[in-house]
Amino acid sequence: MPSEKTFKQRRTFEQRVEDVRLIREQHPTKIPVIIERYKGEKQLPVLDKTKFLVPDHVNMSELIKIIRRRLQLNANQAFFLLVNGHSMVSVSTPISEVYESEKDEDGFLYMVYASQETFGMKLSV
């Protein structure tokens, strides 16, 4: 069972900065993304991992399809993705643009997902 602690709670700021430095050094065309289930989410499963290296040319709709597939959701199940705790992002936006505008000070791009429009904003496919 995955930990109830968030990625930021499990790794120190210094560890996260070093993780990003190594990732960007070894994979310069990949975006380091942390995707976690919204803390109040009950219907959607927890992902088997939280850290993803997303090719920088991928757009948000492709990323959503990948996450939906990993969660094994059917077409009728609602799925909303929130970037950096507050942002609604167009599904046609490349992940590289989202990363540049929304990355955390540690260098990761953080996202949470839920089955409802819990956030007041939504990104759905």
Swiss-Prot record:
Outcome after substituting residue 116 to P: Abolished delipidation by ATG4 family proteins
Distribution of this protein across tissues and organs: Most abundant in heart, brain, skeletal muscle and testis. Little expression observed in liver.
Domain of life: Eukaryota
Keyword presence, Transcription regulation: no
Coiled-coil parts of chain: none
Swiss-Prot/TrEMBL site (Cleavage) positions: 120-121
Propeptide residues, chain positions: 121-125
Outcome of mutating residue 27 to A: Decreased interaction with Legionella effector RavZ
SUPFAM superfamilies in UniProt: Ubiquitin-like (SSF54236)
Effect of residue 70 to A: Abolishes interaction with TECPR2
UniProt KW keywords: Autophagy, Cytoplasm, Cytoplasmic vesicle, Cytoskeleton, Lipoprotein, Membrane, Microtubule, Mitochondrion, Phosphoprotein, Ubl conjugation, Ubl conjugation pathway
Entry's localization field: Cytoplasmic vesicle, Autophagosome membrane; Endomembrane system; Mitochondrion membrane; Cytoplasm, Cytoskeleton
Membrane-related topology note: Lipid-anchor
Post-translational changes noted in the entry: The precursor molecule is cleaved by ATG4 (ATG4A, ATG4B, ATG4C or ATG4D) to expose the glycine at the C-terminus and form the cytosolic form, LC3-I. The processed form is then activated by APG7L/ATG7, transferred to ATG3 and conjugated to phosphatidylethanolamine (PE) phospholipid to form the membrane-bound form, LC3-II. During non-canonical autophagy, the processed form is conjugated to phosphatidylserine (PS) phospholipid. ATG4 proteins also mediate the delipidation of PE-conjugated forms.
Pfam families registered for this protein in UniProt: ATG8
Any Gene Ontology CC annotation: microtubule
Family label: Belongs to the ATG8 family.
Task performed by this protein: Ubiquitin-like modifier involved in formation of autophagosomal vacuoles (autophagosomes). Plays a role in mitophagy which contributes to regulate mitochondrial quantity and quality by eliminating the mitochondria to a basal level to fulfill cellular energy requirements and preventing excess ROS production.
The protein's assembly and partners: 3 different light chains, LC1 (a cleavage product of MAP1B), LC2 (a cleavage product of MAP1A) and LC3 (produced by one of the MAP1LC3 genes), can associate with the MAP1A or MAP1B heavy chains. Interacts at microtubules with CABP1 (via EF-hands 1 and 2) but not with calmodulin. Interacts with FYCO1 (via C-terminus). Interacts with TP53INP1 and TP53INP2. Interacts with TBC1D25. Directly interacts with SQSTM1; this interaction leads to MAP1LC3B recruitment to inclusion bodies containing polyubiquitinated protein aggregates and to inclusion body degradation by autophagy. (Microbial infection) Interacts with Hantaan hantavirus glycoprotein N; this interaction contributes to the virus-induced degradation of mitochondria by autophagy, which leads to degradation of host MAVS and inhibition of type I interferon (IFN) responses.
Listed name of the protein: Microtubule-associated protein 1 light chain 3 beta
